[in-house]
C-alpha cells in the first residue's frame, strides 16, 4: 500500500453512503483534495448489512410467494423444496462484494484517496489513522466530515441476550432456519419477519405494544399487524423477553411475558435483536476535538450539518436525524456544494421535511409527510380533510378470499386549498408507487392537482388520483 498523505483539504471518516457521496462530490465536482478513511468494507450499513442484501432477500421472499400463488393463475408449479439458502447467500454475498469494488473504483475515478484503516480525532484539524498493519499516521485536514454511521444494539440486561444476534448477524446465517424469534417493532424486525415467514420459517415477532411500526400512521399499523397475523407470523403483543437459554445442540429457549402471563418457546434456531441502533462514536476522539454529542451519543449538528467545532461536520446516522441512506447521501452532497461550490451554494442545506420512506414488508408500505395524529396536532382536525380507500389489488382477483392481501391508502389534506401534507399506502408495489407521489408532495401538490391527473388504468396507484 502506498504511503498515505499527511495533508489533505477534506478528510472523511467513514466510507458509507453519506461519506462516499460527500467525498466524491468534493473531489470529483469541485476539485478538492479529499481522503476517505474506512476500517470495514466500503458502502457502510446499506451496502453490506442493510438495504442492499435485505432487498435481495425480499425479492427471494417474493419469488416464494409467487410460486405459492402460481396455481391460482393456472400454473402447475411445485414449490422447490428445500429453498437453497446457502446458494442464495453465496450469490447475495458476491453481489455485495461487487458493489464494494464499484465503490472503491468510483472513489479512484473521482481522485479520492481511500485509506483502509481507523481514524481518531487528535484535534480539530488532525486525525490519527491506524492502518491494517498497525502502523499509525497523523493526517492534517482543513475540514473533517464524520460519517461513521451506527451499530445495532443488543440489550445487555436480559439474561442470555448474548445468545442472540443483531441485524448485522442476520446476513451471516448460513442455513435456512426452521424457527426464528425477532424482537423489535421497527423497519428491520418487520421486514425480516415478513421475509422469513414467506420463505417457510416459523417466525415469532415480539413487540411491546399492540402494533408495530409505531412511528407510521395508525392505518398502516393496524392493517400491517392484521395482515402479518393472517399470513402466519406469530406476533406476540405487549410482550417482553425475560431470559434466553441455550442447550447443548445450540437451540434456544425464549422466556417472555405476554400480557399477564409467563410463557416460553423452545427449539429456536436464531434470536434476532432489532431493538434500535447507537451511533458508532466510540474511540473516535470526539472530546479531543470538542465535538459535542447529545444524551443518546449522537453528534449534535445544526441545519447545515455543522458540529460544535468549526470545520468539523457530520452527516448520516451518526447525527440521529432521519436514518435513511438517501438522506445521508443528499445531506452530504449539499454539504459539499456549500463548502466547496460557488457562492450561490453558501446557504444550501437539506430539507428534512417530507422525506419519503418505504418498509419492504408483506405487503410493502410507503409513507411521506405527516401522520394523521401529527397533522391534527399541527393544523387542527377542523382544518383537515382525510381521504381513505381500502380495496383488493387486481393481482389477487384469481385467488381465494383467504389468500388476498389488503391494499389501503390515505391522503391527509390541510387548509381550504387541501394541500397534501401526508400520504400513506400499504399494498403491492407501494415502494415504486411512492417515489413519484413523493415528488408531488414535495412540490406542494393539492388534492385538486391529484384529481387533475388522468388515472392509469388498471393500476392500484390510480386510486390515489381518484379518491372521493
From Swiss-Prot:
Positions with a binding annotation for glutathione: 17, 24, 103, 333, 410
Binding site for FAD: 17-18, 38, 45-46, 54, 119, 317, 325, 457
This protein's UniProt keywords: Cytoplasm, Disulfide bond, FAD, Flavoprotein, Mitochondrion, NADP, Oxidoreductase, Redox-active center
Active-site residue list: 457
GO MF entries: flavin adenine dinucleotide binding; glutathione-disulfide reductase (NADPH) activity; NADP binding
Cofactor: binding comment: Binds 1 FAD per subunit.
Cross-referenced InterPro entries: FAD/NAD-bd_sf, FAD/NAD-binding_dom, FAD/NAD-linked_Rdtase_dimer_sf, Glutathione_Rdtase_euk/bac, GSHR/TRXR-like, Pyr_nuc-diS_OxRdtase, Pyr_nucl-diS_OxRdtase_dimer, Pyr_OxRdtase_I_AS
A GO BP annotation: cell redox homeostasis
Cofactor: FAD
Coarse class of the protein's main subcellular location: cytoplasm
Catalytically driven reaction(s): 2 glutathione + NADP(+) = glutathione disulfide + NADPH + H(+)
Signal sequence bounds: none
Lineage: Eukaryota, Fungi, Dikarya, Ascomycota, Pezizomycotina
Quaternary structure and interacting proteins, as annotated: Homodimer.
Function per UniProt: Catalyzes the reduction of glutathione disulfide (GSSG) to reduced glutathione (GSH). Constitutes the major mechanism to maintain a high GSH:GSSG ratio in the cytosol.
Catalytic activity, EC: 1.8.1.7
Protein name: Glutathione reductase
Location within or outside the cell: Cytoplasm; Mitochondrion
Matches recorded under PROSITE patterns: PYRIDINE_REDOX_1 (PS00076)
Gene expressing this chain: gtr-1
One GO location term (cellular component): mitochondrion
General remark: The active site is a redox-active disulfide bond.
Disulfides per UniProt: 46-51
Pfam families: Pyr_redox_2 (PF07992), Pyr_redox_dim (PF02852)
Similarity annotation: Belongs to the class-I pyridine nucleotide-disulfide oxidoreductase family.
Positions of NADP(+) binding: 185, 188, 191, 208, 214, 276, 323, 358
Amino acid at each position: 500500500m502506498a504511503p498515505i498523505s499527511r495533508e489533505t483539504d477534506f478528510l472523511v471518516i467513514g466510507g458509507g453512503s453519506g461519506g462516499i457521496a460527500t467525498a466524491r462530490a468534493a473531489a470529483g465536482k469541485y476539485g478538492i483534495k479529499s481522503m476517505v478513511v474506512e476500517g470495514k468494507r466500503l458502502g457502510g450499513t446499506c451496502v453490506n448489512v442493510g438495504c442492499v442484501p435485505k432487498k435481495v432477500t425480499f425479492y427471494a421472499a417474493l419469488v416464494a410467494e409467487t410460486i405459492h400463488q402460481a396455481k391460482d393463475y393456472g400454473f402447475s408449479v411445485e414449490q422447490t423444496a428445500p429453498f437453497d439458502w446457502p446458494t442464495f447467500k453465496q450469490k447475495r454475498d458476491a453481489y455485495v462484494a461487487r458493489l464494494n469494488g464499484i465503490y472503491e473504483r468510483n472513489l479512484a475515478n473521482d481522485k479520492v484517496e481511500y485509506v483502509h484503516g481507523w481514524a481518531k480525532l487528535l484535534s480539530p484539524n488532525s486525525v490519527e489513522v491506524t492502518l491494517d498493519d498497525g502502523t499509525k499516521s497523523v493526517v492534517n485536514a482543513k475540514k473533517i466530515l464524520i460519517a461513521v454511521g451506527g451499530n445495532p444494539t443488543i440489550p445487555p440486561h436480559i439474561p442470555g441476550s448474548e445468545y442472540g444476534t443483531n441485524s448485522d448477524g442476520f446476513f451471516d446465517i448460513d442455513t435456512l432456519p426452521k424457527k426464528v424469534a425477532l424482537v423489535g417493532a421497527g423497519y428491520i424486525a418487520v421486514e425480516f419477519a415478513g421475509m422469513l415467514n414467506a420463505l417457510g420459517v416459523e417466525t415469532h415477532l415480539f413487540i411491546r405494544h399492540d402494533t408495530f411500526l409505531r412511528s407510521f400512521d395508525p392505518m398502516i399499523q393496524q392493517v400491517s399487524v392484521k395482515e402479518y397475523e393472517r399470513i402466519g407470523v406469530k406476533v406476540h403483543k405487549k410482550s417482553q423477553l425475560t431470559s434466553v437459554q441455550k442447550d447443548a445442540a445450540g437451540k434456544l429457549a425464549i422466556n417472555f411475558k405476554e400480557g399477564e402471563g409467563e410463557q416460553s418457546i423452545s427449539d429456536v434456531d436464531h434470536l434476532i435483536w432489532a431493538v434500535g441502533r447507537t451511533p458508532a462514536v466510540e474511540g473516535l476522539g470526539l472530546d479531543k476535538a470538542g465535538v459535542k454529542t447529545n444524551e443518546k451519543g449522537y453528534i449534535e449538528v445544526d441545519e447545515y450539518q455543522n458540529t460544535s467545532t468549526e470545520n468539523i461536520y457530520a452527516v448520516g446516522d451518526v447525527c440521529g436525524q432521519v436514518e435513511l441512506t438517501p438522506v445521508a447521501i443528499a445531506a452530504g452532497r449539499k454539504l459539499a456544494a456549500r463548502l466547496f461550490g460557488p457562492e450561490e451554494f453558501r446557504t444550501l442545506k437539506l430539507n428534512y421535511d417530507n422525506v419519503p420512506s418505504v418498509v419492504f414488508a408483506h405487503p410493502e408500505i410507503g409513507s411521506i409527510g405527516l401522520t394523521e395524529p401529527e397533522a391534527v396536532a399541527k393544523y387542527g382536525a377542523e382544518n383537515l380533510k382525510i381521504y381513505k380507500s381500502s380495496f383488493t389489488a387486481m393481482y389477487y382477483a384469481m385467488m381465494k378470499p383467504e389468500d388476498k392481501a389488503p391494499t389501503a391508502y390515505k391522503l391527509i389534506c390541510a387548509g381550504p386549498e387541501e394541500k397534501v401534507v401526508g400520504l400513506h399506502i400499504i399494498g403491492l408495489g407501494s415502494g415504486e408507487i411512492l417515489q413519484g407521489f413523493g415528488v408531488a408532495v414535495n412540490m406542494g401538490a393539492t388534492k385538486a392537482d391529484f384529481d387533475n391527473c388522468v388515472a392509469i388504468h388498471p393500476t392500484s396507484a390510480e386510486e390515489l388520483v381518484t379518491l372521493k
